[in-house]
A protein has these predicted regions:
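Small-polar-interrupted transmembrane alpha-helices in polytopic inner-membrane proteins
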Residues: 190-209
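Juxtamembrane "helix-exit" motif on the non-cytosolic side of transmembrane helices
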Residues: 204-215, 274-275
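Interfacial non-cytosolic loop connecting adjacent transmembrane helices
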Residues: 210-221, 284-292
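Loop-to-transmembrane-helix entry motif
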Residues: 194, 225-231
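Glycan-association/targeting regions that enable binding to alpha-glucans and other polysaccharides
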Residues: 2-182, 194, 198, 247, ...
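Gly/Pro-rich turn-and-neighbor structural signature
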Residues: 183-187
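Generic detector of multi-pass transmembrane helix bundles and their immediately adjacent loops
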Residues: 229-300
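Non-cytosolic membrane-interface motifs at loop->transmembrane helix junctions
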Residues: 152-158, 213-226
Length: 300
C-alpha cells in the first residue's frame, strides 16, 4: 500500500485532535461532575453562580459545600438552601446560608449532608432581596448532586488519559481508512488496545471504587456508560478481527469496517456521560437494606 503524502497525514492528525478535544469538552459539559452554571439578578446587577453536582460520599466527607456570590447585606436580607433526597417524598429541609469571605470575595455558603455512594440530593436556593423580592436559583427545576466513594488517582487518571488517547487514535484510524489507508491497521489495533486497557480493565476498577460494582451495564444493569463502552469496544474488536495484520484483497471491506468503528466511537461519545448510571434507591435504604446493596442503574 502506497505511503500517503505528508500533508494529508498531518491534516488527518489535526482533524483527529480536534474531534478528540470536542469529545473531551462535550463529555465534561454533559457529565454529572460539571457544575450547574447560570446567573441571577439582584438590584439590577447580575451575578454568576456555579453550583456543585458531585462530591465524595460519607466515607470520606461530611458535607458538600454549596457556594453562591453574596450581593451584600444591603441587597440580600436572607438566603436559604432547600434540599431533600432525590426521588423521595421527604419534606424539603431549609438551611439558612451563612456569610463568608474567601480571598476577598463575599460568599453565601451552605452545606449539603454527604450521602452513601450513589446517593443523590436535589436542591435549590431561595434568595430574598432587601426590597422583599424572591429570587430562585436556578429559576426552574432542581440541581441534582451525586455522591461517590473516593477513586484513587492511580486508577482514575490512567483511565481518563487512556480513553481519550484511544479516541484520538480511533479517529485517526477512521479518517485514515477514508482518505489515507497507509498504517490504518496500526492505528486500529492501537485504538483497540487502548480501549481494552482504559475502558474494559481500568473502567470497571473506577466503577468499583466509586460505586461498589465492577460492571453495571448489559447484562447486569442499565448503565449507559458501560453499555456504550461495550458497543464501542466490540465494534473495534470486529474491525480488527476482520482487517487482520496485513493488507488483503478486500481492502474496501476492511476500510469500511474501520470507518464504521470510528463512527461508533464518535456516536458513543455524543451520549452524555453517566446516563442511567448508579443511583441509590432510598426506598430500599428506608427498609433497612444496606446502601451498598440498594444501588440501581438505568434510571433517567
Amino acid at each position: 500500500m502506497n505511503k500517503s503524502p505528508l500533508w494529508l497525514r498531518s491534516l488527518l492528525w489535526v482533524v483527529a485532535v480536534f474531534l478528540m478535544l470536542a469529545a473531551v469538552v462535550y463529555q465534561r459539559a454533559t457529565g454529572p461532575t460539571h457544575p450547574a452554571r447560570g446567573d441571577f439578578e439582584v438590584a439590577g446587577q447580575s451575578y454568576a453562580y456555579k453550583l456543585i453536582r458531585s462530591d465524595w460520599s460519607i466515607k470520606t466527607n461530611e458535607a458538600a459545600r454549596v457556594v453562591l456570590p453574596d450581593p451584600g447585606g444591603d441587597k440580600v436580607s436572607d438566603a436559604v438552601l432547600v434540599f431533600r433526597r432525590l426521588r423521595t417524598d421527604d419534606p424539603f429541609t431549609r438551611q439558612t446560608l451563612r456569610r463568608e469571605n474567601h480571598q476577598g470575595k463575599p460568599l453565601l455558603v451552605g452545606a449539603l449532608p454527604a450521602q452513601p455512594a450513589a446517593g443523590k440530593l436535589e436542591y435549590h436556593i431561595e434568595v430574598t432581596t432587601s426590597d422583599g423580592r424572591s429570587v430562585r436559583i436556578p429559576s426552574q427545576g432542581e440541581v441534582i448532586i451525586r455522591f461517590k466513594d473516593h477513586v484513587p488517582g492511580w486508577v482514575l487518571w490512567p483511565h481518563v488519559v487512556m480513553m481519550f488517547f484511544s479516541v484520538l487514535i480511533g479517529m485517526r484510524a477512521g479518517l485514515g481508512a477514508l482518505f489515507a489507508p497507509w498504517r490504518m491497521r496500526l492505528w486500529a489495533w492501537i485504538a483497540l488496545a487502548g480501549m481494552t486497557l482504559g475502558g474494559m480493565c481500568l473502567g470497571p476498577l473506577v466503577q468499583k471504587y466509586a460505586f461498589g460494582a465492577y460492571w453495571t451495564g448489559f447484562p447486569f444493569g442499565g448503565d449507559w456508560t458501560d453499555n456504550k463502552m461495550l458497543v464501542m469496544w466490540l465494534s473495534w474488536v470486529v474491525a480488527c478481527a476482520a482487517i487482520g495484520l496485513r493488507p488483503s484483497k478486500r481492502e474496501v471491506i476492511s476500510r469500511a469496517l474501520v470507518v464504521a468503528a470510528g463512527i461508533a466511537m464518535m456516536v458513543a461519545f455524543l451520549i452524555p456521560h453517566s446516563m442511567g448510571g448508579s443511583e441509590l434507591d432510598y426506598s430500599k435504604v428506608d427498609q433497612g437494606i444496606d446502601p451498598a446493596r440498594a444501588i440501581e442503574t438505568g434510571r433517567q
